[in-house]
C-alpha cells in the first residue's frame, strides 16, 4: 500500500484503533520530547501537553471529524467534564507548538528503524532508502498564505496555500525515517539537504534531485552513504572507463554557478552510468557505487526498478495528495504541527 493510500485510510480509524496505536508509543518518549523542547506542562490544565500531543495525532487519524469530536473520542480532557471548548483546544495547540511533535517523530523513527533493520534484507551490505517530496494544501487564511505561499508564489492568486515536505523512506517497511518541512519558496533540494541519512546505505532519488553539490554532500552525510537515480536525458559527460556493455565510469562538469555557491566543489565529478533496455525503452541510471565487482549493473538496475518505480507511492503523492488531503490548521505554526502529527500517524499505521 502506498503512502497516499495509507494516509487516506486515516479517515476511517476508530477510537479503539487509536488506543491500539497508543501502545506503540512509550509515554516516556512523549515526556522526553516535551521536556527537551521546554513544553512540559507545569500547571494543571484540562488539556495537559501530553494529551495535546495525542490530540494532534488524533487529528491525523480522524481527518474528516471536527476537533471536539477527536477530543471526546480519545477522552483527552482531564477533570469531571469531557467537554473542551474548541477555542481552548486551539490555545492548547498554540502553547504546544510544533517542536515536540517534530522531536517525537524523530525519536520514534530512529527507535523503530533500529529494530526494523535487524529483520530486513539489505542490498549487498547497504540499507535501502528513498527520498521525494510531498505538497499539502491548507485553508486560505492571510497568515497561511503570507507564510507558505503556493506553487504560484505569494503574489499570484491561488486557491490554497501549500506546504512542502521532503521525506526519507525505508523502502522495505515504508516507514518514514526523516522529514523536513518548509514553505513553497524552499525547493525540494533545499529541504533534502537537511535530511539525515543512516550510514552504510543507498538512497534512491528522482531525477529532480540531480545536482553535483547535493549528491556529493549526500555521500558525506554519513559513512558509506550512496545514491542511485535515473539519469537525465541531457546529461553531459565523458567516459573515463568502460566497465562492460552499457556500464561506464564517467566524468561530468560542475557548473560555474554551483562552484560559486559552493567553492569546495571542483570543476568535475565522477559517477557510474548504466544503460539498459526496460519494457522496450532505453533507460540510463547513475550512481555513486562505482565498484562494478561488488555492485553489478544488473542488480543495481533491478534495485531501482523494484524498490522505486513499482513499490513506492511517492509519485502518486506528488500528483494527487494536494487534492486528496487538506490540512485543517489556519495558522502556520499549527500547520507544521499538524504535518508532524500526520507523519507520526502514518508511521503508526505502518507498524500496526
Annotate each language-model stretch with its function.
Residues 85, 130-131:
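Noncatalytic, basic helical substrate-engagement surface that gates or grips nucleic-acid strands
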Residues 81-98:
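Major-groove recognition helix of helix-turn-helix-like DNA-binding domains
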Residues 115:
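Glycine/small-residue-rich loop that forms an oxyanion/phosphate-binding "nest" at active or ligand-binding sites
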Amino acid at each position: 500500500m502506498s503512502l497516499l493510500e495509507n494516509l487516506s485510510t486515516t479517515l476511517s480509524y476508530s477510537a479503539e484503533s487509536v488506543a491500539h496505536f497508543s501502545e506503540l508509543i512509550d509515554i516516556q518518549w512523549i515526556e522526553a520530547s516535551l521536556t527537551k523542547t521546554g513544553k512540559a506542562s507545569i500547571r494543571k490544565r484540562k488539556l495537559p501537553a501530553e494529551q495535546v500531543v495525542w490530540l494532534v495525532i488524533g487529528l491525523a487519524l480522524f481527518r474528516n471529524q471536527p476537533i471536539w469530536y477527536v477530543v471526546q473520542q480519545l477522552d483527552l480532557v482531564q477533570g469531571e467534564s469531557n467537554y473542551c471548548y474548541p477555542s481552548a483546544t486551539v490555545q492548547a495547540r498554540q502553547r504546544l507548538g510544533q517542536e515536540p511533535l517534530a522531536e517525537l517523530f524523530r525519536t520514534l523513527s530512529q527507535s523503530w528503524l533500529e529494530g526494523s533493520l535487524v529483520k530486513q534484507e539489505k542490498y549487498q551490505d547497504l540499507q535501502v532508502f528513498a527520498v521525494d517530496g510531498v505538497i499539502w494544501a491548507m485553508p486560505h487564511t492571510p497568515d497561511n498564505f503570507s507564510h507558505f505561499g503556493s506553487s504560484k508564489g505569494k503574489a499570484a492568486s491561488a486557491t490554497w496555500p501549500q506546504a512542502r515536505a521532503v521525506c526519507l523512506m525505508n523502502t522495505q517497511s515504508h516507514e518514514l525515517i526523516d522529514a523536513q518541512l518548509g514553505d513553497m519558496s524552499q525547493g525540494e533540494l533545499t529541504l533534502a539537504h537537511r535530511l539525515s541519512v543512516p550510514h552504510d546505505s543507498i538512497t534512491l532519488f528522482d531525477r529532480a534531485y540531480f545536482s553535483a553539490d547535493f549528491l556529493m554532500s549526500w555521500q558525506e552525510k554519513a559513512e558509506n552513504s550512496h545514491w542511485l537515480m535515473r539519469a537525465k536525458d541531457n546529461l553531459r559527460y565523458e567516459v573515463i572507463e568502460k566497465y562492460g556493455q552499457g556500464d561506464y565510469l564517467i566524468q561530468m562538469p560542475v557548473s560555474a554557478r554551483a562552484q560559486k555557491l559552493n567553492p569546495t566543489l571542483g570543476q568535475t565529478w565522477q559517477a557510474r552510468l548504466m544503460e539498459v533496455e526496460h519494457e522496450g525503452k532505453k533507460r540510463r541510471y547513475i550512481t555513486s557505487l562505482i565498484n562494478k565487482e561488488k555492485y553489478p549493473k544488473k542488480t543495481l538496475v533491478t534495485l531501482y526498478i523494484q524498490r522505486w518505480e513499482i513499490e513506492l507511492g511517492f509519485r502518486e503523492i506528488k500528483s494527487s495528495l494536494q487534492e486528496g488531503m487538506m490540512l485543517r490548521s489556519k495558522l502556520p505554526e499549527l500547520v507544521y504541527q499538524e504535518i508532524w502529527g500526520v507523519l507520526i500517524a502514518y508511521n503508526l499505521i505502518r507498524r500496526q
